[in-house]
Amino acid sequence: MALELDPRLPIIVGTGQIMIRDAATEPLEPAELMAEALRRAETDSGGTGLLTGADQVLTVRELSWRYRNPALAVAERIGATPRRLATSVVGGNLAGVMVARAAADIQAGAAEVIVITGGEATRTRSRLRKAGLEPEWSTQSDSVESPESIGDLRPLVNEMENARGVQLPVHVYPLFEVALRARLGLSVEGHIERIGSLWSAFSEVASTNPN
């Protein structure tokens, strides 16, 4: 019996990555790095027209250069005219949040194709700064509208946590681990084995990544 898939099932159809380590290579600004990663993702998908037909362009907030609307800068480079342009606030979890929300939008029928990207050129900025140079990267006029913002800027630590010195990841993550272990009903040894198996699989995949 063939398995029937939900026609609105969200699927990641392609991924792309670019990393420039060679100092002799012409440096790319963040928007172009993001666009090139998307081009590679489209190639990885085996399809065509995904980028130009994107309903949403979502970008992770970049730190190495400031665009008034990073999502628009990327959309222009990939030839997309999306209904939605959005950029995250700064935060290590926002890329995952955007993937989850994109999946929800596709499941709900609010979009067909959503592209998510991020890119930094911090090493290039640092190298130019040491040489006393400023990058000649693109800028956007003040008339460009800001993108929709994804995420919020709530303090990472609340008053109760501050009062108890629970401020750094090394303090917080163990609490998550204990709570997760309790929820799953695992012993300490069983939890360690489960986590070890999980990260071993991650490591196996990472070992095949040329970047």
What residue ranges belong to the model's regions?
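Conserved "HGTGT" condensation-loop signature of ketosynthase/thiolase-family condensing enzymes
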Residues: 1-87, 104-111, 115-211
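Conserved phosphate-binding catalytic cores of ATP/NTP-utilizing and phosphoryl-transfer enzymes
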Residues: 96-104
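Active-site nucleophile and cofactor-binding loops and adjacent substrate-binding regions
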Residues: 85-95
